Amino acid sequence: MRELFCARAIRAGYRGHEVVHGVSFSLAEGELCALLGANGCGKTTLLRAVCGLTRGEGDCLLEGESLWRMSERERARRIGYLAQRSRELPRLSAMEVVMMGFYPALSPLQRPSAAQRLDAQETLAQLGAEHLAGGDFSKLSEGQRQLVLLARALVRRPRLIVLDEPDSALDFPSRRRALRLLRETAQANGACVLLCTHDANFALRYADRLLMMEAGNLTGDFALDSAQREPLRCALTRLCGPVELAVQGGRYAVLEGDGP
């Protein structure tokens, strides 16, 4: 698969405190990569740096172009981003929030087209959330908001999709639909997905690749279709505590131990 995204020696933090220490990795077209780590290890800071929301040293390249040198508007056209926590968007319907995903591609006086509205409706439907379209976004549950914001991140079919704990508030059926759509979007459009999670089984079940992060450094990188059991188990044990791995449906699964 062709390399689509490359992070080069990223150092980033906040208020003068470095949190991410020279992290490098690349993502290929169609790849869904999970970033696994404990609270406070730097996952969110790394994802924000990838999106140009937190600046530091190094660089992030998408299709050979520096994301950090692009305008904010151009980055927003290339990246679909879902933050860890939703913010209040008063007096907007769920459909209006999803339609905001088109704004970076429109001129200041343009409005989304009828075709784009249909795309927004279809994306909500693919997430099982079409019934939320007319609802007041501010009155939705956290899980419902997460689905709407995920639809906003995906509706424009961006080349790079960055998701901070997209599974944290979703029930199991919603989680399955969301991951199915992410995989279909990545493969159909040649995009790549980088998502962070605390749930080792979630990562093992759905990702093509697993990155592990500890104290601001990447400490593991496994292609899950070819990873050997014992090195993967040892890496997960170091990160999560004692675990055993089984193969279920052709994929690894954690049998024991708590997630980070």
Kindly label every feature range from the protein language model.
Residues 36-38:
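The feature captures the beta-strand-to-loop junction immediately N-terminal to the Walker
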Residues 161-165:
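Catalytic Walker B motif of ABC-type/P-loop ATPase nucleotide-binding domains
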Residues 230-260:
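ABC ATPase nucleotide-binding domains
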Residues 51:
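Helix-to-loop junction immediately C-terminal to a conserved catalytic motif
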Residues 58-66:
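Conserved ABC transporter NBD signature motif
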Residues 197-198:
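H-loop/switch region of ABC-family ATPase nucleotide-binding domains
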